[in-house]
């Protein structure tokens, strides 16, 4: 059960499923001109039965054995589908999860982080570590994804740090019914604006 209703994980190690997934993308997104796809909830966490069987190209395996490749396959298929529909287009995919090799197919981020100073500190180390591991196109949810609205100084410092990350995204689902936005604090929005403008000057 997902927050939107019933759902299932897909076995990307089965050829017919891979073909179905690409066709699903083509019919429901790419046919409308979409060339950027955000693959989310693809880390195959929360599975009750780690011994559930998957095809693994007809050889058979458990999801526990092949879980690491699933998000990579999802993003690879996304890239393939976009290139099949738009041969001369540079596809852009975002993926919440990925393992060795994900940098070939998608941009990733440090997961749904908390709105706190500890999370900001953790994200810096995570992003640097991912870069050293070959995943250079990485970032985090600026200001935190989950929790209450970030306090003013935390938000300013997070933006000032975030402008140097490859992925810059202010993205939240605050539990206090607020939305984290660049202009949320009138006293410091000029600092946010200056930081974002500086990022654009760097590109």
Task: Pin down the residues of each PLM region.
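Catalytic-domain carbohydrate-binding cleft regions of carbohydrate-active enzymes
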Residues: 1-203
């Amino acid at each position: 059960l997902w927050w939107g209703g019933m759902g299932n994980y897909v076995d990307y190690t089965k050829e017919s499923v891979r073909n179905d997934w690409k066709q699903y993308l083509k019919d429901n997104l790419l046919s409308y001109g979409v060339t950027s796809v955000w693959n989310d909830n693809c880390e195959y966490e929360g599975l009750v039965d780690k011994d559930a069987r998957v095809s693994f190209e007809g050889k058979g395996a458990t999801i526990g054995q092949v879980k690491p490749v699933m998000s990579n396959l999802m993003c690879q298929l996304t890239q393939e589908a976009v290139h099949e529909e738009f041969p001369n287009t540079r596809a852009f995919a975002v993926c919440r999860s990925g393992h060795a090799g994900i940098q070939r197919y998608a941009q990733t981020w440090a997961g749904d982080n908390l709105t706190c100073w500890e999370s900001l500190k953790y994200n810096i180390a995570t992003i640097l570590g991912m870069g050293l591991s070959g995943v250079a196109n990485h970032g985090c949810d600026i200001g935190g994804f989950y929790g209450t609205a970030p306090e003013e100084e935390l938000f300013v410092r997070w933006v000032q740090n975030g402008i140097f990350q490859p992925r810059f995204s202010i993205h939240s689902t605050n539990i206090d019914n607020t939305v984290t936005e660049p202009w949320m604090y009138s006293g410091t929005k000029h600092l946010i604006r200056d930081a974002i403008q500086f990022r654009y000057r760097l590109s």
